[in-house]
Amino acid sequence: MEIDFMRILATIINFIILILILKHFFWDKIKRAIDARQEAIDETILKADEDAEKARRLRLDNERILKSAKEEGRKLREEQKKEADRIYKEIVDDAHREAEAIINRANIEIQREEEKVKYELKQQVVDISVMLSEKALGESIDESKHRELINDFIEKVGI
């Protein structure tokens, strides 16, 4: 096989002419398409970087908000516990005061009843003494004077 230099030279010239024609008619369009594609890729990368930064900021904000919410929840829980403890103590103290008041009223009532019973007993003793005296003496004596004597006697005895 023999090499034909003329044919090679003609092919090279044809190729150069083809490239010049393609460059003249299509190079600007191809360059614009490549540049547009490169610009779109750069914008996509820039947008992805911006979105990543925005996501990072949002994550940090969310973590800060979550931490703040947890702290606020803890404080609120502590305040509610303190309030519940205060109310519990207040209820217990009120119950103690009310129980003491009931006991005091009961003691006063018991003392009144005791005084009433003593008075009634004293009256019955006086009545019985007057009856016995009348029966023993066989006559009626001045009842008011007799009651006064019996009351003095009962006072001295301590009934």
From Swiss-Prot:
KW Lyase (keyword) present: no
Membrane topology according to the record: Single-pass membrane protein
Alphabetized GO MF terms: proton-transporting ATP synthase activity, rotational mechanism; proton-transporting ATPase activity, rotational mechanism
Cellular location(s): Cell membrane
Keywords associated with the record: ATP synthesis, Cell membrane, CF(0), Hydrogen ion transport, Ion transport, Membrane, Transmembrane, Transmembrane helix, Transport
InterPro entries according to UniProt: ATP_synth_B-like_membr_sf, ATP_synth_b/b'su_bac/chlpt, ATP_synth_F0_bsu_bac, ATP_synthase_B_chain
Gene Ontology CC terms: plasma membrane; proton-transporting ATP synthase complex
Pfam family for this entry, one: ATP-synt_B
Recorded superkingdom: Bacteria
Membrane spanning stretches: 8-28
PANTHER family: ATP SYNTHASE SUBUNIT B, ATP SYNTHASE SUBUNIT B', CHLOROPLASTIC
Subunit field text: F-type ATPases have 2 components, F(1) - the catalytic core - and F(0) - the membrane proton channel. F(1) has five subunits: alpha(3), beta(3), gamma(1), delta(1), epsilon(1). F(0) has three main subunits: a(1), b(2) and c(10-14). The alpha and beta chains form an alternating ring which encloses part of the gamma chain. F(1) is attached to F(0) by a central stalk formed by the gamma and epsilon chains, while a peripheral stalk is formed by the delta and b chains.
Function noted in UniProt: F(1)F(0) ATP synthase produces ATP from ADP in the presence of a proton or sodium gradient. F-type ATPases consist of two structural domains, F(1) containing the extramembraneous catalytic core and F(0) containing the membrane proton channel, linked together by a central stalk and a peripheral stalk. During catalysis, ATP synthesis in the catalytic domain of F(1) is coupled via a rotary mechanism of the central stalk subunits to proton translocation. Component of the F(0) channel, it forms part of the peripheral stalk, linking F(1) to F(0).
Family of this protein: Belongs to the ATPase B chain family.
NCBIfam families noted in UniProt: ATP_synt_b (TIGR01144), PRK13461.1 (NF009992)
Name of this protein: ATP synthase subunit b
Gene: atpF
